[in-house]
Swiss-Prot record:
Species this chain originates from: Corallina pilulifera
Assembly: Homododecamer.
Sites where the protein binds Ca(2+): F361, Q363, D365, D368, Q370
Matches recorded under InterPro entries: Br/Cl_peroxidase_C (IPR016119), P_Acid_Pase_2/haloperoxi_sf (IPR036938), V-haloperoxidase (IPR052559)
Keywords, comma-separated and alphabetical: Metal-binding, Oxidoreductase, Peroxidase, Vanadium
EC number: 1.11.1.18
GO molecular function: bromide peroxidase activity; metal ion binding
Named cofactor requirement(s): Ca(2+); vanadate
Top-level class of the enzyme under EC nomenclature: oxidoreductase
Name recorded for this polypeptide: Vanadium-dependent bromoperoxidase
Family matches, as Gene3D superfamilies: Vanadium-containing Chloroperoxidase, domain 2 (1.10.606.10)
Active site per the UniProt annotation: H480, H487
Domain of life: Eukaryota
Amino acid sequence: MGIPADNLQSRAKASFDTRVAAAELALNRGVVPSFANGEELLYRNPDPDNTDPSFIASFTKGLPHDDNGAIIDPDDFLAFVRAINSGDEKEIADLTLGPARDPETGLPIWRSDLANSLELEVRGWENSSAGLTFDLEGPDAQSIAMPPAPVLTSPELVAEIAELYLMALGREIEFSEFDSPKNAEYIQFAIDQLNGLEWFNTPAKLGDPPAEIRRRRGEVTVGNLFRGILPGSEVGPYLSQYIIVGSKQIGSATVGNKTLVSPNAADEFDGEIAYGSITISQRVRIATPGRDFMTDLKVFLDVQDAADFRGFESYEPGARLIRTIRDLATWVHFDALYEAYLNACLILLANGVPFDPNLPFQQEDKLDNQDVFVNFGSAHVLSLVTEVATRALKAVRYQKFNIHRRLRPEATGGLISVNKIAPQKGESIFPEVDLAVEELGDILEKAEISNRKQNIADGDPDPDPSFLLPMAFAEGSPFHPSYGSGHAVVAGACVTILKAFFDSGIEIDQVFEVDKDEDKLVKSSFKGTLTVAGELNKLADNIAIGRNMAGVHYFSDQFESLLLGEQVAIGILEEQSLTYGENFFFNLPKFDGTTIQI
């Protein structure tokens, strides 16, 4: 029997009304205005005959720079801003990108022998107009905001860049060995240096901006060094269970009162995740230990001028479970957008972690007479955990390109290095980072030793002093501004979906860490309690901070972007809730420690 036409028309009208209701819900959220920190026009060229803005605190990667790392022509940056705000393809194509070209070969003229010998080409800015795109679900990319980023002269920025230098100097440290005697000297040095900074040793004051207060971290200890501050991130082992463990495989099941285990079923905790009838390994390629990049000034300047060094890194044979800071930096170099959260979802599903009891049809089938799949089941959460990712990216691209345009940490390291060397020439070239140079004294001396060793290994027998931030990636940062972080905003959105669907309060019965000697998991000595929500929060922090460990983001980039991604996911859940006929709610523990119902 067919469906009567009047019923079809009624259904079409109800569908239309639901879409309108979702649009009205999005509209009624309002718009939060975005404000930058004012640095773009604050800093000026020191030459009294040319007091144009220097744009030294802005993202200028790709534009031509002088020998100190400042852009040569401020008009290039102004044209860049106009083009990205218009989104016009021709305007963007007409921008100045990279250095002058050789009239005979047509190749860019680089400063370093390395870039010239490789005949490198330039790389272009990445999706600079993505924040201008409209979407059909969730908050509009321009309707939510991030607070102003810390300024170059602030104690917070000094603390952020100090932390990045220390992470870079400790890339071979194993996460399970932070408290090992063999690492005691480095770990204690890092703790002492951070605790000696105003940002870590001075409490927030009445009148401080709320965003600054929530980012402020207290005393640094072995237990919280380089960790995030989301609920659960400081509990238990550094690495989230969901980035190291595997899952139950097909061939392992309980039928009636019998547990059937195939003799060929992979061990649940060997780092192999069931992806249907195939498996995904949690193991990562092993980047060459001790190999850092952009430690030479000429190479650094070439990268700022758009030299495309992507793919120039090197690896050892094989792969292993994440063990070191460098391993985590490598993981976040090549991950496939929502990879970590899809993997976590597969682990949760395969290991039988229950959905939130407030969702429909969570009783036994004999009581509900139906099981979940398309709605409120595996198909639903597997789709939605990936669906939110690009919506979150569009929101953060708007903040990156159209609002804040914050310089990347590598560029801050460039300013610091030039200024650290400048007194030898009797001048301060970038007084805006004088505080950082002073406060990071001992850290910079260790960075110089590390950079010298790297530059000698790269073929320079007598390298000039270099206080640059050692980078884990040959190409340095991605080709878009620093604030906020794409990895972090996706982490915030995807983890929010997982916490909304699964029973987040469930305790994890067995805790694992990566063995310090062999490529295997071992039971952790941690005696406390880990929960699903805490380990999902920790997963988000691990991925976001992994980018900091590579040298491409600051702590504030990561933290504020996690919160932005959470907003995107909540908006999508609110709108999709209008489409269901069942009476239910999502119970969501938020990143600020509160719980809401959607």
